[in-house]
Curated annotation (Swiss-Prot):
Keywords on record: Cytoplasm, DNA damage, DNA excision, DNA repair, Excision nuclease, SOS response
PROSITE patterns, per the entry: GIY_YIG (PS50164), UVR (PS50151), UVRC (PS50165)
Name of the protein: UvrABC system protein C
Entry similarity comment: Belongs to the UvrC family.
Gene Ontology cellular component annotations, sorted alphabetically: cytoplasm; excinuclease repair complex
Start and end residues of each UVR domain: 215-250
UniProt signal peptide: none
Localization per Swiss-Prot or TrEMBL: Cytoplasm
GO molecular function, one term: excinuclease ABC activity
Gene symbol of the encoding locus: uvrC
NCBIfam families: uvrC (TIGR00194)
Oligomer and partners: Interacts with UvrB in an incision complex.
Organism field: Psychrobacter sp. (strain PRwf-1)
Record GO biological process: nucleotide-excision repair; SOS response
Keyword hit for Cell membrane: no
Length: 614
């Protein structure tokens, strides 16, 4: 039996795909690009299946991602739909179900943040989180484009209206006010220091403020302040005076329009092969903030096609909030179909607009300005990053002639062997790929054994994931030798360039030495762009590892002290921490206060107090 050559196999595949494309209909539908093993590589929709699928093979493809996709296609499946809108909805359902690797458009696809006011307790809770949790009853406000914007709003609400933020369990178990009351960020409804009527008024003011009705709040607070002063209740009058002062300060810093607009303003800019999209969020006439995205699109495609691809990905995969208006910088080829699909999917009406006036035109101008400025900055960063990758390729020429597109780096973090965490960060010529970062909690190795910890992390990662072009290990010859042995056992040693990054003389930054398996070490000068790239990636791996380690260590320590107390089970340990608000507050509690906790009697309170104060 004669095995056909790789060239013959490739020719056969191309002929088979061309024959398949010829038989495709000129009808709307969805197409699935399949890999060698039948795995779904990419899902797309089209007004004409034949024209769209043929475009992947009938023209010169410049975008590296599309070239890589086409090279891996072994089969194509199609589903005919009744309309372009139906095709778009089916496409998004298939993407969510199968998560094809080549459908990743946005590096940062985290859900937006929302401020939430609960509605299932007598004293509602103020909180924030990503996405609208379907199981929670209450009102959601947002979306906020950044964590900073959401947290800042939450802090302002606490200072002005002093709503509680604690969990329901914590709230129910309180016997005395917590620290939030002491710093005037909560009125302690848990222990009855505020009436239900007063708290309800604070809740309503918070809701009105988040909706943009701050003028009504201003009038109400003035009336309450004057009424309290006339009644000689100067403490309460001072409280309303402080609220007024904070409200005026906030109003002076916010861009507020007289209309009650609710819109997302989306502008796209493209230059030198890079694309930036700015999404400006307006709710209640207030600009809540904006966020820049750099989608992985082919900049040679028409800019309105790329904008359409971004909007589709953004609303179906990132946000779960559809505003009444979507104002965009360029008309879309499928604008009505997309508008109809979004309205169907969210079960809410929206209108996509391009020609706008007055305040809407101001919003659009602001989004355009942000997109262009962000693109200019990103291009500068990209050129520097590209220069660093090129410098690294040049430095490594004596070691390897392979291309360098992806780099991964591992680091280990622990405190004297406690709570060991391994991190893996991923970089390419576009920068950090944070969606591909991973943290590994290390188990079953001797405390402080960095070699065994690193071996476990590398094994766990590359049993499931392909190797990068360059694999950096934070450490010298010992760590490098260990990594070599692990990759040899996995049969993957020849699939990557393995480099150990060792601290130089005196462990000073900038004096790092690069170690290789079959090459002499390299000592790069401090001004080397290649060294700067390696240091940047290594430092990011260290940051990612130590952040996770500290979180795990602190959580373990807070419970380990209580675990040493005989007769104190997990439930009562949790009740104690919830009651006092944390370990530090628990350490400051008297024996009598310990006795006041549900399930803690006099004998147990005495035991706890003795153990904590020995």
């Amino acid at each position: 039996m004669v095995t056909p050559s790789l060239t013959a196999q490739a020719d056969d595949k191309q002929a088979r795909l061309k024959h398949l494309i010829k038989r495709l209909p000129n009808l709307p539908g969805v197409y699935k690009m399949l890999g060698k093993n039948g795995d779904i590589l990419y899902v797309g929709k089209a007004k004409s299946l034949k024209s769209r699928v043929n475009s992947y093979f009938a023209k010169t493809i410049d975008h590296p991602k599309t070239r890589a996709l086409v090279s891996r296609i072994h089969d194509i499946e199609t589903i005919i739909t009744r309309s372009e809108t139906e095709a778009l909805l089916l496409e998004q359902n298939l993407i969510k179900e199968h998560r094809p690797p080549y459908n990743v458009l946005l590096r940062d696809d985290k859900s937006y943040l929302y401020v939430f006011i609960s509605a299932d307790q007598p004293y509602p809770r103020l909180a924030y989180g990503r996405g609208k949790a379907k199981h929670q009853k209450g009102k959601f406000f947002g979306p906020f484009p950044s964590a900073h914007a959401a947290k800042e709003t939450l802090v302002l609400m606490q200072k002005m209206f002093q709503m509680r933020q604690c969990t329901n369990t914590f709230f129910r178990q309180r016997k005395r006010p917590c620290l939030e009351y002491q710093i005037k960020r909560c009125r302690a409804p848990c222990v009855g220091l505020v009436s239900a009527e007063e708290y309800a008024a604070d809740v309503q003011n918070t809701i009105r403020f988040l909706k943009g009705d701050s003028s009504d709040i201003h009038t109400t607070l003035i009336e309450k302040m004057e009424h309290s002063a006339e009644a000689l209740d100067f403490e309460k009058a001072a409280f309303y005076r402080d609220q007024l002062s904070m409200l005026r300060e906030v109003q002076s810093r916010q861009a507020v329009y007289t209309v009650q607009g609710e819109a997302d303003i989306i502008s796209i800019a493209s230059q030198a092969g890079m694309t930036c999209v700015n999404v400006l969020t307006v709710r209640g006439g207030r600009v809540l903030g904006g966020k820049n995205y750099f989608p992985d699109v082919d900049s040679n495609e028409p800019i309105n096609d790329n904008l359409s691809a971004f909007i589709t990905s953004f609303y179906f995969q990132v946000t779960d909030d559809l505003p009444a208006e979507i104002i965009i910088s360029h008309e879309l080829p499928d604008q009505m179909a997309l508008q109809e699909a979004l309205s169907t999917y969210f079960e809410a009406k929206t209108v996509i607009k391009t020609n706008v006036r007055e305040h809407r035109a101001e919003w659009l101008d602001l989004a355009k300005l942000n997109a262009h400025n962000a693109l200019k900055t990103k291009l500068g960063d990209y050129l520097e990053l590209h220069a660093r990758f090129a410098a690294l390729k040049e430095v490594l020429e004596p070691v390897s002639q392979s291309s360098i597109d992806t780099i991964e780096c591992f680091d280990i973090s622990h405190t004297m062997g406690e709570a060991t965490i391994a991190s893996c960060v991923v970089f390419d010529q576009g920068g950090a790929r944070k969606r591909d970062y991973r943290q590994y909690a290390i188990h079953g190795v001797q405390d402080g054994d960095d070699y065994a910890a690193m071996a476990q992390a590398i094994t766990r990662r590359y049993k499931k994931h392909p190797l990068p072009d360059v694999l950096l290990i934070d450490g010298g010859k010992g760590q490098l030798s260990m990594a070599k042995n692990v990759l040899t056992e996995l049969g993957l040693l020849n699939d990557t360039l393995l480099i150990g990054v060792a601290k130089g003389e005196g462990r000073k930054a900038g004096l790092e030495v690069l170690h290789f398996i079959e090459h002499e070490p390299l000592d790069l000068p401090m001004d080397s762009k290649a060294l700067h790239l390696i240091m940047n990636i290594r430092d990011e791996a260290h940051r990612f590892a130590i952040t996770a380690h500290r979180k795990k260590r602190d959580k373990r320590r807070s419970s380990s002290v209580l675990e040493a107390i005989p007769g104190l089970g997990e439930k009562r340990r949790r009740d104690l921490l919830n009651h006092f608000g944390g370990l530090q507050q628990l350490l400051g509690a008297s024996q009598q206060e310990l006795e006041g906790v549900n399930g803690i009697g006099k004998v147990m309170a005495n035991t706890i107090y003795k153990v904590l104060h020995e």
